[in-house]
């Protein structure tokens, strides 16, 4: 078993000397996407789709 892994097999957030276990540059390029990034993209998509519906509902109003 690796010296860096905890008893549950996960890599700790910090090394014993206090440095981060994973460099911040690699946090953005490896592994899964951060939840806040997924939620932000999803929220923007929902607002965009709702905007399209509101735009469509007002198209033609007053043209008749």
Swiss-Prot record:
Main localisation: membrane
Keyword terms of this UniProt record: Membrane, Photosynthesis, Photosystem II, Reaction center, Thylakoid, Transmembrane, Transmembrane helix
InterPro entries, per database record: PSII_PsbJ, PSII_PsbJ_sf
GO terms, biological process: photosynthesis
Subcellular location: Cellular thylakoid membrane
Annotated transmembrane regions: 35-55
Pfam family of the protein (one): PsbJ
Any single Gene Ontology cellular-component annotation: photosystem II reaction center
Membrane topology: Single-pass membrane protein
Subunit structure: PSII is composed of 1 copy each of membrane proteins PsbA, PsbB, PsbC, PsbD, PsbE, PsbF, PsbH, PsbI, PsbJ, PsbK, PsbL, PsbM, PsbT, PsbX, PsbY, Psb30/Ycf12, peripheral proteins PsbO, CyanoQ (PsbQ), PsbU, PsbV and a large number of cofactors. It forms dimeric complexes.
Record function comment: One of the components of the core complex of photosystem II (PSII). PSII is a light-driven water:plastoquinone oxidoreductase that uses light energy to abstract electrons from H(2)O, generating O(2) and a proton gradient subsequently used for ATP formation. It consists of a core antenna complex that captures photons, and an electron transfer chain that converts photonic excitation into a charge separation.
Name under which the protein is recorded: Photosystem II reaction center protein J
Organism: Prochlorococcus marinus (strain MIT 9515)
């Amino acid at each position: 078993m690796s010296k860096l892994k905890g008893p549950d097999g996960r890599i700790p957030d910090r090394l014993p000397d206090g440095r981060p276990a994973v460099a911040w540059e690699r946090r953005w390029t490896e592994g899964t996407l951060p939840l806040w990034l997924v939620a932000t993209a999803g929220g923007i998509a929902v607002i965009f789709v709702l905007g399209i519906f509101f735009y469509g509902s007002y198209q033609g109003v007053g043209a008749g």
